[in-house]
């Protein structure tokens, strides 16, 4: 290290209290040529990035306007900008922006030069405004003859993003597995509408990336202009970027190759949006002169959390061989809690948190936003303040919630034909649209079921079903029947669960997810004696979710999805709903990404980490997450079960391949094997009941039956 470099680091340590480790220092000093900086959780990534940029300007004399830092989100760009201003207040600002912002600059400049009028189609979904969602809703209805649900619309939007970010040609649009009827035709019409359905060209955010890449490919003058604009590029969170984003950056740095890519393939969790972590694994093939640095020292978490997390992530094969470590001392042991039933989970968490004086650094993490609703209800009743990080929770406007409310509204007034029209298809009375239209032509002066029986032509089998439903509604007293009892009528007497099953089979919905919504409503119903109070409570919770997102008070508990938690840290972290089918999901092909998602969750914790599962979800038996079991076995390998646990076939298949050891005869003392969690090891001893293995982390003992039945061991490659 020369005098200038030494002076820079000494001054920053003195003025900022920032002292970099050897790898961080290398990353700061490596300014020319391609650099891949693989940053494990809590490794001081942002500090290193800011110090690197500051070093280039202060020590090397690089003009700040010649540096471009590209981030994953607007929030990240803002955070970087603020951090840079704090570290280097005397320096001019650097250009921190998202890749979409960079792409839009290129597109806007080109279209304006060509005199082409354009508009952005991503505006909010307001009446009278041409928006992406509104256009897609209309196209879906035209092609399918029915309205699109919010779930389907979300899937459709994700599908379009995936197609464009992957740069898939039209003949490959059908490849993506999305359960939206006529998805390809919808996308074709959507693209046509943007070109011809308005007095100007319409562009969405994904178009910006494709169009910018296309402009760079076809217009050498524009590409040369942007190449001259910046001498140094830095991309953050690059494990979350897609082929089209990589292509854009590759074109811009092709001449000077001064590219610093900051990423962690172990935290790649956005493949469903088109992200490709394989780009990181192939970085040296793309840039043969690249230097790869591993920032693996974790400054965030206790050794009690870091060491098991490091072992856990090594089960993945698509990764660099890096070992996360920490010099932090051990703290509280990781807690594993399996409750008797799902309906006890929210109360259990309230009991854990209600006596804490400082809750501001506590987070509850979950896979799906539906998991937040029982927590909101329980926290509000217990007077625990909370902050919803995710701004959009569609639970309260979900069509299943709306169905349930309409069944209840019909109980208030069985003469209401308008409400009946919304649910008649979903109560298994086999009423046809023609019969419904005939009912609508009658005056609203009698019970809809009586009107059907007396004034509408029915098939011979229909009166029996209609009379049965009428009898149930006659037994319901709106101001006395509890919402819990009403939900039982809806689910079973009206056959709503059967309806959900049929809809899932025909329209591609996830049946378990739909039932989860009904189950959550059941939890809320337990605390409301009347249907009127139940409806009021739902509205209250909806408003609470909205206001809690806007008001992040200092002592509030954070509720957030695992995806949204990336980049955050909390003193206390609780991962909930850890069961098979939720985490990991039921898609076997995505097991490595599911593993990474779990890894992201556990590495948010600083001192206290608790994993929570349950044996039953109401009356249905469920299986605790195999990830939870795996981590527990890492933490406490001596705590062997008395017999091999029963796991679903799905979980078994996730481990098995042609090298999986399934017979005791293949367990040979002295042979090298690979444990799916602990990695390479050597067999030291084998008995009929146990097997002893030596790993880099020490000697471990397992049940022989467990290893064989679960497929935990593999033979080593020759």
Where are these regions (language model features)?
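P-loop NTPase Walker
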Residues: 1-117, 224, 307-310
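Conserved RecA-like helicase ATPase core segment
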Residues: 2-12, 16, 55, 243-339
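Conserved helicase NTPase motor core
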Residues: 8-9, 18-29, 33-41, 95, ...
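Helicase P-loop NTPase motor core
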Residues: 41-49, 289-291, 296-385, 412, ...
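Conserved helicase core region in the C-terminal RecA-like lobe
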Residues: 97-105, 234-237, 262, 533-589, ...
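ATPase/helicase motor core of nucleic-acid motors
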Residues: 102, 330-331, 356-481
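Accessory C-terminal helicase-associated subdomains
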Residues: 455-564, 585, 608-612
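C-terminal accessory regions
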Residues: 578-699, 704, 712-718
């Amino acid at each position: 290290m020369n005098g200038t470099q030494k002076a820079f680091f000494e001054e920053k340590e003195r003025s900022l209290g920032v002292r970099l480790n050897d790898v961080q220092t290398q990353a700061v000093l490596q300014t020319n040529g391609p650099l891949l900086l693989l940053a494990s959780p809590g490794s001081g990534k942002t500090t290193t990035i800011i110090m690197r940029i500051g070093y280039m300007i202060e020590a090397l004399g690089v003009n700040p306007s010649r540096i471009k830092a590209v981030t994953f989100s607007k929030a990240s760009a803002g955070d970087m900008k603020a951090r840079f201003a704090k570290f280097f207040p005397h320096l001019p600002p650097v250009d921190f922006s998202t890749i979409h912002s960079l792409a839009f600059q290129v597109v806007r400049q080109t279209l304006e030069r060509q005199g082409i009028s354009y508009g952005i189609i991503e505006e909010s979904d307001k009446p009278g405004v041409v928006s992406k969602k509104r256009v897609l809703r209309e196209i879906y209805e035209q092609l399918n003859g029915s309205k699109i649900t919010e779930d389907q619309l979300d899937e459709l939007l994700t599908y379009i993003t995936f197609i464009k970010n992957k740069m898939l040609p039209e003949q490959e649009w059908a490849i993506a597995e999305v359960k939206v009827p006529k998805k390809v035709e919808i996308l074709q019409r959507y693209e046509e509408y943007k070109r011809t359905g308005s007095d100007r060209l319409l562009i969405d955010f994904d178009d910006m990336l494709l169009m910018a890449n296309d402009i760079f490919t076809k217009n050498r003058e524009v590409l040369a202009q942007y190449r001259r604009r910046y001498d140094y590029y830095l991309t953050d969170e690059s494990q979350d970027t897609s082929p089209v984003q990589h292509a854009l950056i590759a074109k811009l740095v092709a001449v000077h190759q001064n590219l610093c890519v900051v990423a962690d393939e172990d935290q790649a969790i956005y493949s469903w949006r088109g992200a490709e972590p394989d780009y990181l694994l192939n970085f040296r093939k793309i840039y043969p002169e690249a230097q790869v640095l591993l920032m693996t020292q974790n400054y965030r978490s206790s050794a009690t959390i870091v060491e098991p997390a490091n072992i856990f992530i090594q089960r993945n094969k698509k990764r660099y061989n890096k070992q996360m470590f920490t010099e932090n001392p051990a703290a509280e042991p990781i807690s594993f809690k399996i409750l008797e039933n799902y309906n006890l989970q929210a109360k259990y968490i309230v009991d854990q948190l209600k006596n804490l004086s400082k809750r501001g650094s506590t987070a509850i993490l979950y896979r799906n936003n539906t998991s937040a609703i029982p927590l909101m209800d329980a926290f509000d009743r217990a007077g625990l303040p909370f902050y919803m990080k995710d701004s959009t929770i569609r639970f309260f406007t979900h069509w299943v919630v709306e169905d349930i409310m309409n069944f209840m509204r019909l109980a208030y007034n069985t003469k209401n034909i308008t409400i009946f029209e919304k649910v008649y298809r979903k109560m298994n009375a086999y009423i046809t649209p023609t019969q419904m239209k005939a009912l609508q032509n009658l005056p609203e002066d009698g019970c809809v079921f009586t009107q059907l029986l007396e004034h509408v032509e029915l098939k011979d089998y229909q009166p029996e079903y209609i009379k049965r439903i009428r009898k149930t509604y006659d037994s319901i007293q709106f101001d006395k029947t509890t919402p819990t009892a009403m939900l039982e009528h809806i689910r079973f007497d009206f056959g709503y669960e059967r309806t959900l099953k049929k809809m899932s089979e025909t329209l591609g919905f996830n049946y378990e997810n739909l039932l989860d919504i009904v189950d959550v409503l059941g939890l809320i119903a337990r605390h409301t004696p009347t249907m009127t109070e139940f409806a009021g409570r739902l509205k209250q919770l909806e408003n609470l979710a909205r206001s809690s997102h806007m008001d992040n008070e200092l002592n509030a508990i954070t509720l957030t999805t695992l995806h949204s938690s990336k980049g955050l840290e909390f003193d206390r972290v609780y991962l909930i709903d850890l069961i098979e089918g939720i985490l990991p999901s039921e898609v076997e092909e995505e097991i490595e990404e599911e593993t990474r998602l779990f890894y992201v969750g556990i590495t948010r914790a600083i001192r206290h980490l608790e994993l929570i599962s349950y044996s039953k979800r109401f009356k249905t038996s469920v299986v605790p997450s195999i990830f939870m079991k795996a981590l527990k076995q890492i933490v406490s390998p001596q705590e062997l079960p008395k017999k091999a646990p029963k796991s679903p076939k799905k979980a078994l298949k996730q481990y098995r391949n042609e090298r999986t050891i399934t017979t005791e005869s293949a367990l040979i003392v002295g042979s090298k094997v690979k444990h799916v969690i602990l990695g390479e090891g050597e067999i030291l001893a084998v008995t009929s009941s146990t097997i002893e293995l030596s790993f880099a982390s020490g000697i471990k003992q397992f049940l022989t039956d467990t290893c064989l039945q679960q497929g935990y061991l593999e033979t080593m490659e020759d």
